[in-house]
Amino acid sequence: MHEHYQPREIEAAAQLFWDEQKSFEVSEQPGKETYYCLSMFPYPSGKLHMGHVRNYTIGDVISRYQRMQGKNVLQPMGWDAFGMPAENAAMKNNVAPAKWTYENIAYMKTQLRSLGLAVDWSREVTTCKPDYYRWEQWLFTRLFEKGVIYRKNGTVNWDPIDQTVLANEQVIDGRGWRSGALIEKREIPMYYFKITAYADELLESLDELPGWPEQVKTMQRNWIGKSRGMEVQFPYDQASIGEAGTLKVFTTRPDTLMGATYVAVAAEHPLATLAAQDNPELQAFIAECKGGSVAEADMATQEKKGLPTSLFVEHPLTGEKLPVWVANYVLMHYGDGAVMAVPAHDERDFEFATKYNLPIKAVVRTSAGDETPAPWQDAYGEHGELINSGEFNGLDFPGAFDAIEVALLKKNLGQSRTQFRLRDWGISRQRYWGCPIPIIHCDSCGDVPVPQEQLPVVLPEDVVPDGAGSPLARMPEFYECSCPKCGAPAKRETDTMDTFVESSWYYARYASPHYEGGLVDPAAANHWLPVDQYIGGIEHAILHLLYARFFHKLMRDEGLVSSNEPFKNLLTQGMVIAETYYRREANGSYTWYNPADVELERDSKAKIIGAKLISDGLPVEIGGTEKMAKSKNNGVDPQSMIEQYGADTCRLFMMFASPPDMSLEWSDSGVEGAHRFLKRVWRLAQAHVSQGLPGALDIATLSDEQKAIRRAIHLAIKQASQDVGQHHKFNTAIAQVMTLMNVLEKAPQGSEQDRALLQEGLQTVALLLAPITPHISHELWGQLGQSGAIIDAGWPALDESALVQDSLQLVIQVNGKLRGQIEMPASASREEVEAAARSNENVLRFTEGLTIRKVIVVPGKLVNIVAS
């Protein structure tokens, strides 16, 4: 055994062993308990960042621990390889996205391997490869034929210069991020998944996920947004509108119907179009609304604006004429593109009515009283007793809901209904680097799915996009084809799928990644699924996790999987944060400096008082800790850390610095501390092994001192087992091992029994650290004379008898103050403990002249003597 800890050699040897032995390749083993551990697969952006390292280390610790529990563990890895960053990089570097992506995958794979992950690389999937997306297209055609996927017009952000559709995040202050052109809203045909058909089940089956964080489930519940309300119809005022009809609105507050003072419609609503015919001002306003963002979040924060029309509708219960306004806060794709405005009890309506001097009529008695003067108060939105509502006065919310529904039903102008905030999932993207949508457009036959035998529709990989629209739409060699039904010349769909589609089913493909008979081999899928432990960032709480749950139900209904949910347990790991440093330039901009380029200045108490740039010695500002990001230049390159300290040190620091679900603050001194600890473990083991391995430990003949050491060993096993196995508190498990090391380093090594005890201690350290620092544990296990690899060893068994103490140290208090300690046999009775405490020298001193009123004995811990 080498005298010094040499992580590079140790880690290379361990990884070579695992590769040669195919240690982590698994197959279905009927009868053996399975465990499927999965971390969200990475986007191949170029190189790993510390967030990746943390995510994959957490998954690896759990996987290795479960293997030590005797389970057949699957931990696969792949690449979420389609997406816009590849197109942007391609335009910047004039290189095909495919080439850029595959080069990044190759580099990042070597980085992941250097971490020593227990990954079954034989199951690797890459979502931009035809052998993967072929099955996505196969499922698409089946769902299209069933009507679960359909085509309709959708509103998008259109860049008139680049002639392309932009995602909401590519629209900056109403302009295209690349061209700077003013963005228009356009209606274009798009494909949609009918996720709303599963809304009830997606909501209800959240209750079947006790292993998910409550926060994530709440976010999904809110996103699905089930609400019971009323569909109310306002008859057209025929004198102003010129025809009969009704304006439909949905409201969750029908109790406030008598307080409606106007109605507002979206810019795209037919009444807005009608009103604008001879109104240039309204036409200009509608065009402005259509140029705004289509994102709901932007709508909520933007200034409320509107224009009146000359149109009116009638109140369904009073017949009163209400003016129709066009407003920018009404969304065409929510409800029916119209709202009944009750300014007294809705904040948006209040803001709008106050701005345009519209009537505000209070109809609910709230904790703020019977009036609703400006400014808006949250109390105005409360439920309460109805006022100013005619026959409905005095009713509470449930009573008013029912009574108003009866009144509306009599007039055939309304009824209660359940509505969801969730909208069908539009998956068409006018982009190149994505999975082609397998549809052919025929003038005679309409939209025809590509037949199964013609799949996959392969995306050409030698294309360099230029940012002006989809390259596929300019490639006749791609889109010209024959109709599969009638044989006539037809046109292939040139849109590609949202990249969230690929990540919605990848976890299932890992069960049978090379299966040629379908999307999954049902037998393999049902063997491994659902995933036992899924790990990823909370930022995926809604979209990815909701879409994956939806896809799982689609696959179930296609007979591909038998379970209802994809992920049994979910761990959302915290961010990796680090200090930021900057200088503010003369023009007001910020220049950010990497922590590695900054030197800290400290006072005599080691408190940081300033910082300066190493290169010029001039001061920089300390910006506080933030998430590691390119924009703040506060990232630490994992590769340089691994090269300097080794993967085990990085893994140990990551797991020790904080619990996995909390933010982790990067600390160079913390990394150095982790490295020092591993050197201590190595040093103790090396000194022990160099003297030759001892014989077996004879537990029956241990001295009291030796029993205390063995108790420390088994106490560490007990605590670490709870921390790792039940709570994923890897940081406290590591602390237990550190405490044990303190004991072992001080343990005597004079006798054969002493050395046999140290052998048990070192074996325990190796086993407890094996999931966290697998390379050094692999080496130590062999050096300690153990046969077989540590990855095939079981988690250390707890010997409960080792925890039993012959004698106990008890604290003595007089009137609650510490006055001494006594050592008592563990078997001592309460009376014996009390007698020993009363006769203790210190107790006698502090109770002299006092009467002992009461003696409280807390078994195994303390004695408190109350005297006065």
From Swiss-Prot:
Name of the protein in its database record: Leucine--tRNA ligase
UniProt record, GO biological process: leucyl-tRNA aminoacylation
Disulphides: none
GO molecular function, one term: ATP binding
Source organism, top-level taxon: Bacteria
Compartments, as annotated in UniProt: Cytoplasm
Residue ranges annotated as motif 'KMSKS' region: 627-631
Catalytic activity, reaction form: tRNA(Leu) + L-leucine + ATP = L-leucyl-tRNA(Leu) + AMP + diphosphate
GO cellular component, one term: cytosol
InterPro entries for this protein: aa-tRNA-synth_I_CS, aa-tRNA-synth_Ia, Leu-tRNA-ligase, Leu_tRNA-synth_edit, M/V/L/I-tRNA-synth_anticd-bd, Methionyl/Leucyl_tRNA_Synth, Rossmann-like_a/b/a_fold, tRNAsynth_Ia_anticodon-bd
Assigned EC number: 6.1.1.4
